[in-house]
Regions:
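Surface-exposed loop and adjacent secondary-structure segments within mature catalytic domains
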Residues: 1-2, 11-122, 127, 131
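Short, hydrophobic/amphipathic alpha-helical packing segments
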Residues: 4-8, 120-124, 162-170
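Active-site His/acidic residue clusters
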Residues: 32-37, 107-114, 132-171
Length: 171
């Protein structure tokens, strides 16, 4: 907060009561919105630090873009801590381990440019893993790029993101 006091995040609250937790985004997974649910940093631009914090937490599922913020040493430490890592929707993973999926170096491609993995596909993976907890789960799912299409005044971009969001809501 503004007094430099650490405030418990939503994911920390959920984990404290035994819920499973997840983050899903079409931006970098360390971007402002997903970061605000799980990290303690002074600036949204501290994406390397956010990745380090995520790697040292017990988040059950993390799916999105941003591999460039996870150096090999951090990925190896994360995997060695008992988690699984995928970088393609076609990769196999152990359903009993925490899962990190980073599908691009930066944000995922816009929906209208045929991104490799849809928001709905990521949500299906996350929910299927998280839903096994009898105490419930919290997952933040963000269709991150609707805003970006608006900034660019790009109707195709906005339409693709809205259609992707509609598919997610229909799921």
């Amino acid at each position: 907060n503004s007094n430099q006091e650490i405030v418990k995040t939503v994911l920390e609250w959920a984990e404290e009561i035994g819920m499973s937790t997840g983050l899903v985004a079409t931006s970098t997974i360390t971007h402002a919105t997903p970061a605000s649910f799980a990290s303690h940093v002074e600036s949204r631009k501290m994406e390397h630090e956010i990745a380090e914090q995520f790697a040292n937490m017990e988040i059950d599922v993390i799916l999105g873009g941003g591999k460039k913020f996870w150096p090999d040493s951090l990925l190896n430490d994360y995997i060695n801590s008992g988690a699984d890592f995928i970088d393609s929707i076609n990769d196999d993973y152990d359903d009993n381990k925490r899962l990190l999926g980073l599908f691009s170096d930066g944000p995922l491609e816009p929906a209208y440019m045929n991104r490799e993995i849809s928001t709905t596909d990521m949500a299906k993976i996350a929910i299927s893993k998280l839903d096994k907890n009898p105490l419930g789960f919290f997952v933040m799912i963000e269709e991150s790029q609707v805003d970006w299409g608006g900034h660019q005044n790009n109707a195709s971009y906005i339409k693709g993101e809205m259609e992707s969001l509609n598919d997610l809501v229909d799921y």
